[in-house]
Every structure is written in structure tokens, then in C-alpha cells.
Regions:
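Terminal, low-structured helical/coil segments at or just beyond the last alpha-helical repeat
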Residues: 154, 159-182
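Conserved alpha-helical positions within TPR/SEL1-like repeat arrays
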Residues: 5-18, 25-28, 32, 41-56, ...
Length: 182
């Protein structure tokens, strides 16, 4: 096992133990080692791991930079699933920052890639992200529409647990929109 890979493994172990600052340092070292070796794909994975740790540390601006850097590297290597994952990650950071419009833009990009790849469950996950973000914006009818889209995709994908959660969210929102019986 080469040094960069060992450093990545060290980072994973540190994350598991809750040592986020130390994990961040390990992923930064791995990212630099992979960059020096010209291995853009593994560099992008280290960059993603770094950004995920930065989210845990609530350093959102740095996390966005990390996810965007990983996105660019994954785009260069045509790793479309990883590209979509980065868009989803970017969307979630924007959502956590209270930037719903930016979140929606990123989630929509992720959704488009997953749909193009025929990955229904992952597409449905993005629909639930869009629904939740629409709910945050008080766009309740749109949120309901997106929960229903997720429900359909989860059903097609055979993802029963996620389908049940989407159905529950859609039912609660639909009931709230109908208001109390007169």
C-alpha cells in the first residue's frame, strides 16, 4: 500500500473515531500526495473526504471550496456519478448555510446527471432534497410535487424504506395544505 493510500486509510480511521481535525490533516496530506503523483481521480476522492470533514467541523466555506475542487477533477475524468455526488454535496452545504436558491441549483444539476445515468434511487434522493429546500422557502405546493416525484422514483427503484419516508412526508404536507376539516 503506497503512502497516499495509507494516509487516506488513516483519515478514514480518524473520522470513525471522531478525530475530525486529525482526519482533516490526513486527507489534506493524501490530497497533496495524489496531486504530486498526477492521480486526479484519487486526489478528487481525498478532496471530497476533506470537504466532508470540513462540513462536520462546520467550516462551510472551506467545504464548498473542497467540493468544487473535487467536482472539477471528477469532471475531467468523466466520473459522472462522482460529479453528481459533488453537486449534491454542494447543494447540502448551501442548504445548511440558508442559501436555498444556490442549493436548488446544485440539487437540480445532480438530479439531471442521475436521471441521465438512469439511477432512479439517487435521482429520488435529489428530489427529496429539492422538496425539503422548497419547503424551507415556503413553496409548499412545489415541495409536495417534488416529494411525489421522489415517491414515484423510489417505487420504480424498489427502495421501500425511502419510498415509505417520502410517502409520509408527502402525506403530512398534503394534509397541512388541505387545512383542518370544516
Amino acid at each position: 500500500m503506497d503512502t497516499a493510500e495509507k494516509t487516506m486509510q488513516e483519515g478514514y480511521t480518524l473520522v470513525q473515531s471522531g478525530s475530525h481535525e486529525e482526519a482533516l490533516e490526513a486527507f489534506l496530506r493524501a490530497e497533496a500526495l495524489y496531486a504530486a503523483a498526477g492521480d486526479g481521480q484519487r486526489q478528487a476522492r481525498a478532496c471530497t473526504n476533506k470537504a466532508l470533514v470540513l462540513v462536520q467541523l462546520r467550516r462551510f466555506a472551506d467545504a464548498l471550496d473542497g467540493f468544487r475542487a473535487a467536482l472539477g477533477l471528477f469532471e475531467k475524468s468523466d466520473e459522472f456519478i462522482r460529479v453528481a455526488e459533488q453537486y449534491g454535496n454542494i447543494g447540502s452545504v448551501h442548504r445548511d448555510l440558508g442559501q436555498p436558491d444556490e442549493a436548488l441549483e446544485s440539487y437540480t444539476e445532480a438530479l439531471a446527471v442521475y436521471r441521465e445515468l438512469g439511477l432512479r434511487e439517487r435521482a429520488a434522493d435529489q428530489c427529496t432534497n429539492i422538496a425539503y429546500t422548497r419547503f424551507m422557502k415556503k413553496e409548499y405546493e412545489e415541495a409536495l410535487r417534488w416529494y411525489r416525484e421522489a415517491l414515484s422514483l423510489y417505487t420504480q427503484a424498489g427502495s421501500e424504506e425511502k419510498r415509505a419516508l417520502a410517502a409520509e412526508n408527502a402525506a403530512r404536507l398534503a394534509a397541512a395544505l388541505e387545512g383542518p376539516p370544516e
